[in-house]
Amino acid sequence: MKRQTEKYSLYSSVGRSLLAALGAVTLMTACGNDSDPAETATADSADSVVPAPATAARTSPSSASADLEARHSEPSGYSVRDSAGIQVIETAGSAWTEETAWTVGPEPLASLGGERTGGTSLHGAGRIVILSSGGFVVAHPQGSQLVWFDPNGRFQHAAGHLGRSPGAFMIVGDILAMPGDSVLAVDPEVRRVSVFGPDGEFARLESIDFREAGSPSAVSVLSDGTILGTREFEFEEGMSAGLNRDSVPLVILQPGGGFTNTRTLFPTSQHWLFEFGEGLAGGPAPFGAESHVAGTVDGFWFGSGDTAEITYHGADGRLQKILRWQGSAEPLPAERFEKFEADAMAAAARNGAALAEMRNFLRDLPSPDTTPYLGGMIVDSDGRLWIRPYHVWTEQAGGWWTVFDANGRRMGMVEIPAGFEIRAIGSDRIYGVWTAEDGVESVRVYALNK
């Protein structure tokens, strides 16, 4: 949990553990509204600000079951028009029928941990990247390693160890796949990038101005070799207790040093701040508006969670497309909110030092009427966009994901196994982390049946 003291933003040791417990999200832009782009701020103007959508724009509540019914019964609607040079896509219903809808295999093709991963448990696994060979690489922060697997999930090799020498990590952060199946791994502690070859051999180090650039999270490698990054919410002068949103640029990092900011500022996810001691503390607002990004080689998708709308921007932040779909926000029953509060207190009680902060965090936390429209986005290896249903950090992953094709047409919904958090999606397989009832995590691979 973040705290503010005087003019400085800092993490206490207690706060770091609680921030992790709060399921801190990567903070992205929120850039959806009901106006056409010609009527709002554009990405061409210097230091322009994309307005945060008003929560009043949410439509009447619905449920995943209603969407599932629509997947099989509503006719597919799809239109594309131009507005001031920006493509506006509107889609409704589903292109899939009950017979053609995609499904996930009932059992995993591979469940990875222990002996099958060279003795590494993979508990706490981070990002997963898919290689052109069909193999994949798993970031394992707890082991200070990257772990390579072949297309069938067989362990190949691991690279990295704890340390500051070349090829070592103090912290394994984001990893990204590069052309030629090299893998780029960020170490935010020592502010550098390590590049490993397809065989897992360490290739080179590159320094990057991470902290000077606002300690961004790496999202994707762009076609020119630069790295798209996103910034976190930061405390600012004048912020007060309650719900807060910041506006920040995205950042383009140049390997070897240097960075540039997008000219457009984007609102971050919503944060809940409360008075704690002589300053403020806080974290992402549970069930509050969340912003997410999904990168491509040419740009990135943004979604705010406030409306059934996402936007696509070029690498310079320039708005290119608006994608709107027919849908409504899921209602938030009082029972669900109360269960979250109870589960959050139970989690904090297991970490006694964080109990007081959690109690203060929850004391006046508002309960919205509905949940965000999305809880995450992933672009698969074929360019399709997958939108994750929202769940707060105490809730089980899985549920019904919505799929759009590369042209923005809504294809339908795919049910993901309970407890499975997707990290990467290939042409015919899904990769992610599954959490057992006892909290033990393992990496799983499921078939994607089309």
Which residues are covered by each model-predicted region?
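Sec-dependent bacterial lipoprotein signal peptides
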Residues: 1-28
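Eukaryotic scaffold repeat domains enriched in small/polar residues
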Residues: 31-450
